Design a protein with these regions (language model features):
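N-terminal beta1-alpha1-beta2 submodule of the flavodoxin-like/Rossmannoid cofactor-binding fold
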Residues: 1-142, 206, 210-261
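Short, glycine-/small-residue-rich phosphate/pyrophosphate-handling segment
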Residues: 48, 141-194, 211-214
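Short, surface-exposed amphipathic charged segments that create phosphate/polyanion-binding patches used
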Residues: 196-204
Length: 261
């Protein structure tokens, strides 16, 4: 499900920079897919200020031919738990998470996006990471954890401190799940502390903020560069990182225990 709010226009300066960078790109990216999970607390069609930053990033992806999609997890009934499908357990009658996981599985680049509340990522973002973690026992075709070879990043907005704290937690979580994190994989915008204007409010200065636009641009290009390298090289090499091989006694650089010989 995608939001129906209007896209945030790029500033003229950012549009010119993006056009120039696209013309001199070192590779083609049109076979890549990027998914934004907008972990706003607002259900569609309520305005999401986080979507404003997403639109800037989305435009840079699309200028390079990357296929993009935006989903608001809050629009779905996502059960709590660590199962693959909690509707198959006695605890829950319904679980929409498998629909979202299917979209995640089909993408090369995942950008988790959240607003800051009480210095933390949103409760929706936390549940998304919990559900993703519930799939980490599954393996890919090479016998690695299933999300090896995918790229992860984060975009954050708010009116209080916490962007770097949220990014630290989100990027670690994605890495732990199996994602590869590029350099400078976080970008964010903070308005005036307190009840000041939010990103999309008139006069906020958000869409024109040079620091946010620079970091968002670096984030998107680094995601594309890394995804390109991973895709062209078949992902992460399958050596020394396969759980079943380890359990079978093939412990790279360690002697097999006596009972495995």
């Amino acid at each position: 499900m995608q939001t129906n709010q209007n896209s945030t226009p790029m500033s003229d300066q950012l549009a010119q920079i993006t056009e120039r960078q696209c013309q001199t790109a070192p590779a083609a990216y049109s076979d890549l897919k990027a998914l934004f999970l907008n972990c706003t607390l607002n259900r569609t069609p309520v305005l999401s200020h986080t979507r404003g930053v997403i639109d800037i990033a989305k435009a840079i992806f699309e200028a390079n031919g990357v296929e993009t999609k935006v989903i608001r997890p809050v629009d779905y009934d996502i059960a709590a738990g660590l199962g693959v499908d909690m509707a198959q357990t006695p605890e829950w009658d319904k679980d929409d998470w498998p629909q979202i996981q299917k979209e995640i599985d089909a993408t090369d680049i995942l950008v988790l996006c959240t607003s800051v509340w009480l210095g933390e990522k949103s409760s929706v973002c936390n549940r998304v990471l919990e559900r993703m973690y519930g799939y980490t026992h599954l393996l890919n075709a090479k016998g690695q954890y299933r999300d090896y070879g995918k790229v992860g990043a984060t975009l954050i907005t708010g009116n209080e401190d916490g962007v770097k704290h949220c990014a630290m937690n989100i990027l670690f979580s994605l890495s732990h799940i199996g994602y590869t994190i590029p350099p400078q994989a976080d970008a964010g915008w903070l308005g005036e502390v307190g009840p000041g204007p939010s990103y999309l409010d008139p006069g906020s200065g958000g869409p024109e903020n040079d620091f946010t636009n620079r970091n968002t641009t670096f984030l998107i290009w680094n995601c594309m560069h890394l995804a390109r390298m991973l895709k062209d090289n078949g992902g992460i090499p399958a050596h020394g990182n396969q759980p079943d091989a380890w359990d079978a006694g093939c412990k790279t650089d360690f002697k097999n225990p006596e009972h495995k010989r």
